[in-house]
Amino acid sequence: MPTRGLLYYITDRTAFADDEPTRRRRLLEKIAEAARAGVDYIQLREKDLPVRDLESLAQEAITLLNQLRTGHKSLPTALLINHRTDVALATGADGVHLRADDISPQEVSTIWKKCGAGTPARELSPRRPVIAVSCHSVAEVTQAASQAATFAVFAPVFEKKDSANSKPAGLAALCEACKADIPILALGGITLSNAHSCLEAGAAGIAAIRLFQENNIAEIVRALR
């Protein structure tokens, strides 16, 4: 990549062809692998889980990351919870990943502050939450920017092999989205061969599920940086 792009690993434990306990173990191993490799953000995106199971998995992931941070103070990885601000707060996650039709980033920040998250007593949490927003149009990107989101994830940029009904936006649309006053991460069909073109179009980084989860993450990070 021409510059050091941000890297965002989005989890999907259902891609592992195992029983549920093994899936959870393998996912936690991938989360640790991503953190050690220097991935900037990890989104726990296990939408099928009941809230109690999601909380349990999130707590395991956060405990794991905190253990890694103890030995590596410069560990950059932040854990975001998909959609569930309540779970993010309850477990001490670093932030939340919102859909475009979720509550606004401003509301999340207000709730976060009222709950006392990120105070010195919880020094492993940020003083302000990391708030990512999924966007599928320039209008949604503009809205995310106006509501003080940390960054927007623009998708799908390229065709995804498992989403025949999802029309890719393409690099031209990504370039237009990147004109907004907010960092943009490109998602959707990202590979090692096309990731460079996303940064050249103005993206601040890339987000992916398969690219990270189905490969050696350390090797992927080295190839991208």
Predicted features by range, described:
Residues 1-105, 109-114, 128-151, 166-169, ...:
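Conserved N-terminal beta1-alpha1 strand-loop-helix module at the mouth
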Residues 155:
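Flexible, gly/ser-rich surface segments that form the specificity/activation loops bordering the active-site cleft
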Residues 161:
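Conserved beta-loop-beta/alpha segment of the NTase-like Rossmann-fold superfamily
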Residues 204-208:
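Acidic, Mg2+-coordinating phosphoryl-transfer loop and its flanking beta/alpha structural elements
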